[in-house]
């Protein structure tokens, strides 16, 4: 009899249609447009978390909104992480693991996120999109073929002078709308759902401080991906290298025979990359890793170049380090009087080595997307997420799509469909965990 009742229960909760639900009190698009107005750009090398105080403006807003939606145990940690828990509504004897969802509050330091002027291109009918604040910024169909799937949709961009902030305020808006939807529809059955919003994801933020035990999730998902349907259980393995050039400074008026200008050696080092380092971001795609000098500081006495090393294969990182050292050796031969030093730190490892042991995480996500009308596929991330580091710490955490495109640049965009379908997928996902668990 218990088995029969369980089957009936599962059939009931699996047949709830998202289209039959009571709508949330605020749409994902409306929330998104509010959140992008808040500048939350993080900063490299701040030496603290959060790296910028302005991230706490959004953290406090989310804290209030979570409490208003009835989320329990809402708190902001010393590092600026917002935590909360949505209690399950299943029978007491139903065993469903607590599932967590994470989105990050900061935007990339690469481009300004201040004074974002979001533009809604209603009922998009095809063609390139010229951004009105800087008409040299054009979202082209050639470089963005997914635009062909957005005919009739409302596309959201910035005006061409800033980031939009879709990375990752889309994820935040979608999670908040999921929470709202669950509140409005108690007939949607789910287990405990843990929520977290993190600072400084873009600059290697405080995931070593993330309170996994106190948060309570057994499995989690980051909501930090791009186009609809992209689900990721694989990221880069990542190191960050620093090359330091040390010369000798003196007053330029009396520098003859004395000054050793380190910036010349640093410039020579960079100039060798096109010939000696073929795999760079602008020359690679798919599963091919890259070496990327991304930050330089130069002076006569000391110059520093920071370099990203990225590879899906952990053993490939050693080869990339060797390649950088060959460039250093060539530069050293030309500038023997400049001291050149190399160092690197490990950022995160490809999470696939752990997640391959938990295929249900991505299987359930693919099924949830299917129920939302989205064809989903596993696609490796040419990047990293908070989930990379949480997975390494023992909390398996793949990544889900948000509908966004062109992260970290002025051509960033999302759409009404992207936001809504991502939200639907999240709602279906918590239902599926309730259905499939015993």
Region annotations inferred by a language model:
Residues 6-15:
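Bacterial N-terminal signal peptides
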Residues 17-21:
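Boundary at the C-terminal end of the N-terminal hydrophobic targeting segment
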Residues 25-53, 156-157, 249, 348, ...:
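N-terminal capping segment at the start of a domain
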Residues 28, 260-279, 315-330, 364-370, ...:
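His/Asp/Glu-rich mid-to-C-terminal helical/loop segments that flank catalytic regions of hydrolases
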Residues 46-96, 100-102, 106, 116-117:
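A non-catalytic alpha/beta surface segment that caps or lines the substrate-entry region
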Residues 92-192, 421:
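Active-site metal-coordination/substrate-binding segment of hydrolases
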Residues 147-236, 278-294, 305-312, 318, ...:
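Acidic/histidine-rich catalytic neighborhood of metal-dependent amide-processing enzymes
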Residues 264-283, 290-294, 339, 347-398:
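Active-site-adjacent substrate-binding region
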